[in-house]
């Protein structure tokens, strides 16, 4: 007779291996049905399209969850070094289709929904974008998480679960209006709340110094509750975690008020604590010293570091008891990557934990912190650099200010020893800036407290070393690296452009999807007529599809055979949407001058959001829409030319417009765009680039060959020389008749007859204080655009150039970027090894 099973043996039956996997269309249909009825509690008589989307999302999520659990089991068994990517922005977009692509479920789900009388594409369109970012910074973080999972790295993305993401943009009467992005109003099927890991975060209070050391006391506490979202790698059974923190008031919040009849007010006051995770600040290129923003930055850092240390101390899966108490191995097991300066408080916070709570001495705590942290810089614009007022830090985070002062003193002692007698250097390198308002320079804090500092394109990294961080480079040159940005080919080719992905796979197989350098094999097809024809056909199909979308969404009819000329990015003076406007007006004026002259038909599309408080950016949007009103309604223009402003540009719209674009506008003033990643997405999807030698454009032109790029304008050195000489817009105005005509039109109200002085601020800016020197590049830009039109007349040569660009875009995979971070900053070797599937033994 067999002995009775122990409780431990019985529990072994609770295993992910015991669950049947979803492997075929029949299983998918059953699970869809089960979720519709049992999870959503609906039947087909009352189910809405959104219910069907949720049922499909839950069905696909089932396929993720077993892999997610197994991945975490694997990490706890192997105890690898873990990567923690801290970012205040994580611009994920939609999840359903990306998950199906990475798990190889797309065809089966398509067939299952078809058999159920549903259209999968329509269901995909119901999903809200997770718009937890302003633009490139947050989208880069999302691409990086995808690549870290694909490369088998034990990585975690940490950020804030903003209740309201980047605002929805509405264009009313040509003006941008902002609407709240209530992306969670229907719920989010991809996240899992983890209330058991809720952590306290402290603010305000004061510091007591005792014989045992410093104590931060009398603080206000806010709780950080984590929500986990799975991040699947590409077909390797790895599913990593993105953990977003939501602010909650503690149950005893303002309890003292209860005794004096203030119960209702105390409950209402809970909102004040919970405001921390309420909304994303919609501005990442102008620093605003808002207390709530500083609270957000510390909130994510404090919760994340507690989580990291808990995980470091416990090495067994599910074990909450500390196993490690010694921090010598911390930098060997933990890498913290700071995505810009927003999470820079991780440096003083880690020191606070190690010194005040774990009782390490300062030198040991500093050594551990520096070896653990690394910093990525994303901007050279001085107005974007974070410089927090000391008085704000003193009130909100008094202990951290003391620690920053201590870091600064010790750091400046090192500088003084390395450069004796150079007093001005001490002033320039100090973490504390003296002035009318004393400030903490967060970039300086990051450089001092990290073992690696990287820019995000080769030219950007050189600018950092030669200009804004020159003093720091001279002190510690070994810290400075370059890591050129990249994009995930899963979302930015396979998902958004399946036709092109298939045409490529027919020639070189599918391995390129996780090894993008293999695209170079396409160079041998440059003269293959069938391949040229297939690439051109896919582009035309994408253009027809996007034209139909514009007609449905915007009620705008465009010519799908026209050249699709696209500039989509945040609206900012340095990105020079104004230069694009000057070209549009030039084309219009030429048509009016010579109405019978042949012109290559163009549809010029501009999209992007302006920060709500950025007056000039909002005026630029108004100008674009005003020009469109004139051009699109002028019978002399006809079908040759259209100007469209793409409202509410976001990840899901990018996935539609980028595959349809013929020409990608990357026209920032040389030396201002750190890298750019939109440029890479267009290149991979078969658009040619017109651009300046700025950011990653330089490396893209190098890869493709400058002959296969429409390069124009000043180089960085030219801009520097012009700055020294003094830029004078009047010179260009006097010398160039076409430019003069445009400025006269803007000044006289040609594009705003009801309000002739509407664009006076734009005219005043470009004529008298244009930091980004639009006029200086105008002539070359117009000539370069003429070359674009000339080449477009020759479809075969155009497509050959497109193929050359696609074939040489492999360098710009985020897999390459992350492999470099892993080897050169985190001290890890990426792995292409596939984890066992859930029904296999680990």
Curated annotation (Swiss-Prot):
The modification N6-(pyridoxal phosphate)lysine is found at residue 681. GO terms for cellular component: cytoplasm; sarcoplasmic reticulum. The keyword Cell division does not apply. Allosterically regulated through the non-covalent binding of metabolites, being activated by AMP and inhibited by ATP, ADP, and glucose-6-phosphate. The activity is also controlled by post-translational modifications including phosphorylation. PROSITE patterns: PHOSPHORYLASE. PANTHER family: GLYCOGEN PHOSPHORYLASE (PTHR11468), GLYCOGEN PHOSPHORYLASE, MUSCLE FORM (PTHR11468:SF32). This is Glycogen phosphorylase, muscle form. It comes from Rattus norvegicus (Rat). The gene is Pygm.
